[in-house]
Swiss-Prot record:
It comes from Gallus gallus (Chicken). Plus end-directed microtubule-dependent motor required for normal brain development. May regulate microtubule dynamics during axonal growth. Required for normal progression through mitosis. Required for normal congress of chromosomes at the metaphase plate. Required for normal spindle dynamics during mitosis. Promotes spindle turnover. Implicated in formation of bipolar mitotic spindles. Has microtubule depolymerization activity. PROSITE patterns: KINESIN_MOTOR_1, KINESIN_MOTOR_2. Belongs to the TRAFAC class myosin-kinesin ATPase superfamily. Kinesin family. MCAK/KIF2 subfamily. Keywords: ATP-binding, Cell cycle, Cell division, Coiled coil, Cytoplasm, Cytoskeleton, Developmental protein, Differentiation, Microtubule, Mitosis, Motor protein, Neurogenesis, Nucleotide-binding, Phosphoprotein. This is Kinesin-like protein KIF2A. Gene3D superfamilies: Kinesin motor domain. PANTHER family: KINESIN-LIKE PROTEIN (PTHR47971:SF24), KINESIN-RELATED PROTEIN 6 (PTHR47971). One of its GO terms (biological process) is nervous system development. The keyword NAD does not apply.
Length: 706
């Protein structure tokens, strides 16, 4: 008899349930609990499977057509009510969506009709009528019951009335949504070559429960924060009828609808889901992005900390727009970028009583890193040298720090720096940044460093794949970007796990930002910007995978079974690496070797050899240029000495022995210095040849570039 209490509830059917927050949606019955007369249900929400145990009374109040018959056993002629069919809103990683089924709407209408049948309290009357009078041809059991007994004697309870009202509202809402979908379908351009994919994406989105991020959502504290920002389709993509394949249904979920094709040429969608700290859709302005990302880091620098904010993504995905400000044609409104918004909050915090008494001074620097070289954007792109002193502190020699008193001073510096930043035209963007731009806000107290906020607009990550280009300059650009992004990931790994060693020497970018990854009071935020177009799908997935790996590094190591820990090597292991990779040892090369070994899936031995050849070539280039500058300065002194010797020969009784001795000394010095310079130039030319040969040995089937 206990099983009869469950009525028509069976394992596997979908029932309406009410959540603690008042929401009503459908869930699947997974078990029937006879001991306490309850059922266990499960549903999928935001990619996670959730479940709860609900008593039968609550189930029957929302699903009256599933309630058991009262007192009188149903006759064999009484047909059971069909279980309602429904769809469940899902966000499932790797879900496939095949071409849309055209008869979806009638199925839904049938379910609506079945739920509107007679109330379960009338079922005993139907059964009794059938037993006494038999089945009347053309008259349903419900009609026969009404004819025999008249209207039911039981009155509807308030709960049932409320449920019926909710059901009526739900059906009206579904009809409105169906009408809206049909209207959108009429607006779709059927001439679009990707019309089928467009319909699949539209139908998939129609079943999602959208809850985007709003300014009312709380701001969580993260030592490492990773978020994603989607930009809208631009004019070029719209004219080419490109499709928007990115969906952001909630505040922390990003979905990519990747078009695929089967062997039989059937097209389908591979829906891939990623989760981050925050996800911003195309409607989110810069102010909202700043509020959840860089703004929580401002207070860190007032507490003697180091804060870093990166903008990462492919060319044209909106990095410079996010960091520098809104674009109107080629003109940029710097007042709406994260640079200026962070500066505004810095000056506001300076006025707080607890910080005002510190008498802090604010300075700003702006430089770029291009092909492994550092240039000062506030000093006519003067080339700078990056050195490490005896205290293992990295110094950028010659970098200008400008004192700023207000936000307007910061805006002027940003405009000066942006005007001379290295850029070029690419297929993705007519004004593409090809360098890492680093804007730093520095707090000093009595001349000593108090805190530093580094805001970095990274170069396009797709340039990291250009390591096999025929053009050397493009190869160097790609190699430096590829290496710096790998090093950046490993430095964030070390920061998130509080590891003692950080491979910051592996690239110029991480070397300059060394103090941002060292120390307990360091915080980092990464804003991954993505393009929504189907043509950019591969680069978008690479960006999301990179950002996802960075975020995975911040979780508890005990819960991260598939994440490889930081590998610390003994001197003997370093020697083994030397044998494996075939290179010598230096702090820079050791970090590069460890970096490549920890990313074996992305860096093949041939690619590592190329990176090592590029690093060696860049080092030799700096030495040759520095020695050439020294020879030039010595040449000026030699000219003065030789001029004095020639003037001495004009005298009648000059000392011939002294003249010959001094001239020989000058010539010997010239020969020694010039010979040394010539040998270095020969070695440099050999390094250029090695770099070119190494670029040709890179396996074209190597793993994708980050």
């Amino acid at each position: 008899m206990a099983a009869a209490n469950f009525g028509k509830i069976q394992i596997g059917i979908y029932v309406e349930i009410k959540r603690s927050d008042g929401r009503i949606h459908q869930a699947m019955v997974t078990s029937l609990n006879e001991d306490n007369e309850s059922v266990t249900v499960e549903w999928i929400e935001n990619g996670d499977t959730k479940g709860k145990e609900i008593d039968l009374e609550s189930i029957f109040s929302l699903n009256p057509d599933l309630a058991p018959d009262e007192d009188i056993e149903p006759s064999p002629e009484t047909q059971p009510l069909p279980a309602p069919s429904a769809k469940v809103n899902k966000i499932v990683k790797g879900r496939r969506t095949v071409a849309p089924v055209k008869n979806d709407t009638p199925a839904r209408d049938n379910r609506v009709a079945s739920s509107a049948r007679a109330r379960p309290t009338q079922l005993p009357e139907q059964s009794s009528s059938s037993q006494q009078n038999g089945t009347v041809s053309g008259i349903s059991p419900v009609q026969a019951a009404k004819k025999e007994f008249g209207p039911p004697s039981r009155r509807k309870s308030n709960c049932v009335k409320e449920v019926e009202k909710l059901q009526e509202k739900r059906e009206k809402r579904r009809l409105q949504q169906q009408e809206l979908r049909e209207k959108r379908a009429q607006d779709v351009d059927a001439t679009n070559p990707n019309y089928e994919i467009m319909c699949m994406i539209r139908d998939f989105r129609g079943n999602l429960d959208y809850r985007p991020l709003t300014t009312a959502d709380p701001i969580d504290e993260h030592r490492i924060c990773v978020c994603v920002r989607k930009r809208p389709l631009n004019r070029k993509e719209t004219l080419m009828k490109d499709l928007d394949v990115i969906t952001i249904p909630s505040k922390d979920v990003v979905m990519v609808h990747e078009p695929k094709q089967k062997v039989d040429l059937t097209r389908y969608l591979e829906n891939q889901t990623f989760r981050f700290d925050y996800a911003f859709d195309e409607t989110a302005p810069n102010e909202m992005v700043y509020r959840f990302t860089a703004r929580p880091l401002v207070e860190t620098i007032f507490e003697r900390g180091m804060a870093t904010c990166f903008a990462y993504g492919q060319t044209g995905s909106g990095k410079t727009h996010t960091m520098g400000g809104d674009f109107s044609g080629k003109n940029q409104d710097c007042s709406k970028g994260i640079y200026a918004l962070a500066a505004r909050d810095v000056f506001l915090m300076l006025k707080k009583p607890n910080y005002k008494k510190l008498e802090l001074q604010v300075y700003a620097t702006f430089f770029e890193i291009y092909s492994g070289k550092v240039f000062d954007l506030l000093n006519r792109k003067t080339k700078l040298r990056v050195l490490e002193d005896g205290k293992q502190q990295v110094q950028v020699v010659g970098l200008q720090e400008r004192e700023v008193k207000c936000v307007e001073d910061v805006l002027k510096l940003i405009e000066i720096g942006n005007s001379c930043r290295t850029s070029g035209q690419t297929s993705a963007n007519a004004h593409s940044s090809r360098s890492h731009a680093v804007f730093q806000i520095i707090l000093r107290r009595k001349g000593k460093l108090h805190g530093k906020f580094s805001l970095i607009d990274l170069a396009g990550n797709e340039r990291g794949a250009d390591t096999s280009s025929a053009d050397r300059q493009t190869r160097l650009e790609g190699a430096e970007i590829n290496k710096s992004l790998l090093a950046l990931k490993e430095c964030i790994r070390a920061l998130g796990r509080n590891k003692p060693h950080t491979p910051f020497r592996a690239s110029k970018l991480t070397q300059v930002l060394r103090d941002s990854f060292i120390g307990e009071n360091s915080r980092t935020c990464m804003i991954a910007t993505i393009s929504p177009g189907m043509a950019s799908c591969e680069n978008t997935l690479n960006t999301l995978r990179y950002a996802n790996r960075v975020k995975e590094l911040t979780i508890d190591p005990s819960a991260a079974g598939d994440i490889r820990p930081i590998i610390h090597h003994t001197p003997s292991q370093i020697d083994d690496l030397d044998t494996q990779w075939g290179v010598g040892s230096s702090p820079q090369r050791d970090d590069l070797k460890l970096l490549c070994e920890q990313n074996e899936e992305e860096v093949s031995p041939q690619l590592f050899t190329f990176h090592e050849a590029v690093s060696q070539m860049v080092e030799m280039e700096e030495q040759v240029v520095e020695d050439h500058r020294t020879v030039f300065q010595e040449s000026i002194r030699w000219l003065e000495d030789e001029k004095a010797l020639l003037e001495m020969t004009e005298e009648v009784d000059y000392d011939v022995d002294s003249y010959a001795t001094q001239l020989e000394a000058i010539l010997d010095q010239k020969i020694d210095i010039l010979t040394e310079l010539r040998d270095k130039v020969k070695s440099f030319r050999a390094a250029l040849q090695e770099e070119e040969q190494a670029s040709k040995q890179i396996n074209p089937k190597r793993p994708r570039a980050v």
